[in-house]
From Swiss-Prot:
CDD domains: Rho (cd00157). Keywords: Cell membrane, GTP-binding, Lipoprotein, Membrane, Methylation, Nucleotide-binding, Prenylation. This is Rho-related protein racH. The keyword Lipoprotein applies. It is a lipid-anchor. Belongs to the small GTPase superfamily. Rho family. It comes from the Eukaryota. Residues 178-200 are annotated as: Disordered. One of its GO terms (biological process) is cortical cytoskeleton organization. The lineage of its organism: Eukaryota, Amoebozoa, Evosea, Eumycetozoa, Dictyostelia. The keyword Nucleotide-binding applies. GO terms for molecular function: GTP binding; GTPase activity; protein kinase binding.
């Protein structure tokens, strides 16, 4: 029997959420940027020998949709919070905007996967902003208590499959109480470090 999993993808405008989903579901990279309002994709996968159907919800990151976006949150099994590895601003908004929005609109907060996008551009001098390192990403994961931190590229597909496999895995095999306790402990420990790295 196939397990249906609702995956909600959120993050700032232009961090590559739609490209991420199109690349994963169609194995192709979109040629031009098209701002998303709301869109849905579906993908079948097998995680630990269990067939799953991922219902992937693409959301608009712009402020004009702030009041409408959370209407799609009920029933979400796992959130993917995206930021661009070449945008410090989008990274900061993980803890300033996206994590608080999830907390405020969900009675029970489902697992969260934190994802750094545009891996192929990091270190290429393509951004005027400070780039985000793997260490900074892990600190942010701890600060918000996310289940996993991953980095990927929609263009090269490096790390792409891992993102969605982890999303399916955390729903199929929820963390134990011990793992959750450790995550919360890491969260408290990482909170100061993460805020320090954000304001550097």
């Amino acid at each position: 029997m196939v397990k249906d999993i609702k995956v909600m993808v959120v993050g700032d405008m232009s961090v590559g959420k739609t490209c991420l989903l199109i690349s994963y579901t169609t194995n192709s990279f979109p040629g031009e940027y098209v701002p998303t309002v709301f869109d849905n994709y579906n993908a079948n996968a097998i995680v630990n020998n269990t067939p799953i159907n991922l219902g992937l919800w693409d959301t608009a990151g712009s402020e004009e949709y702030n009041s409408f976006r959370p209407l799609s949150y009920p029933g979400t099994d796992v959130f993917i919070i995206c930021f661009s590895l070449i945008s410090q601003t989008s990274f900061e908004n993980v803890i300033k905007k996206w994590h608080p929005e999830i907390i405020q609109n969900m009675e029970q907060v489902p697992p969260i996967i934190l994802v750094g996008t545009k891996l192929d551009l990091r270190g290429k001098g393509k951004s005027e902003e400070k780039e985000v390192t793997p260490e900074m990403g892990e600190q942010m994961r701890a600060a918000i208590g996310a289940y996993k931190y991953s980095e990927c590229s929609a263009l090269t597909q490096d790390g792409l499959t891992t993102v969605f496999e982890e999303a399916g895995r955390v729903v199929l095999f929820p963390p134990s109480k011990e793992e959750l306790a450790k995550s919360k402990k890491d969260s408290k420990k990482g909170d100061k470090d993460s805020k320090d790295c954000i304001i550097q």
